[in-house]
Regions:
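Active-site ExK catalytic segment of metal-dependent nucleases
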Residues: 47-58
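Non-catalytic C-terminal interaction segments of nucleic acid-processing enzymes
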Residues: 1-45, 59-151
């Protein structure tokens, strides 16, 4: 059973995240909404949680904006202390690897990709957080791959 954080808005009609629910329904994946302490998606009884981000702008805000950073880091620490492996899945067309992140630059905050990559490495080393990338079309498949195989 896939657990979906009840703060995720992807079940609302017309929502830009409808593709995730459609993927699960098409593939017969059972899911239930409930409040998750860590991440947005988790298998019942599993030790991996996926925290989906809409793109590098969102994760850069989580890592560099004071208010967002505190909330995000609290979640990272909760996962680490609970023994849950946190995987941040960044959904953005054209971003497939760390080299793409390094070349990126925020249009809103001026954060460079190189700085963002440094922040990501720090979380990987300190807390075991893993960062993965996908586009919109493959997001549902990647969430399930990560949760079922750990890859």
């Amino acid at each position: 059973m896939l657990l979906v954080d009840d703060r995720e808005k992807w079940t609302q009609a017309g929502n830009r995240d409808r593709h995730l629910r459609d993927y699960l329904d098409r593939h017969g994946i059972m899911w239930r909404r409930e409040r998750l302490d860590v991440g947005d998606y988790m298998l019942e009884g599993g030790g991996i949680s996926v925290d989906r981000k809409y793109g590098l702008e969102e994760i850069s805000k989580n890592l560099t904006n004071r208010a967002d950073n505190q909330r995000f880091m609290d979640e990272v620490r909760r996962a680490y202390e609970s023994g849950i492996r946190l995987v941040v899945l960044i959904e953005q067309r054209g971003i497939t690897c760390r080299d793409d992140v390094a070349r990126w630059r925020s249009t809103y905050t001026g954060v460079s990709g190189a700085y963002l990559l440094k922040c990501m490495y720090r979380l990987e080393i300190s807390y075991g957080v893993r960062f993965c990338f996908c586009d919109r079309r493959s997001c549902g498949r990647r969430i399930m791959e990560i949760l079922t195989t750990g890859k």
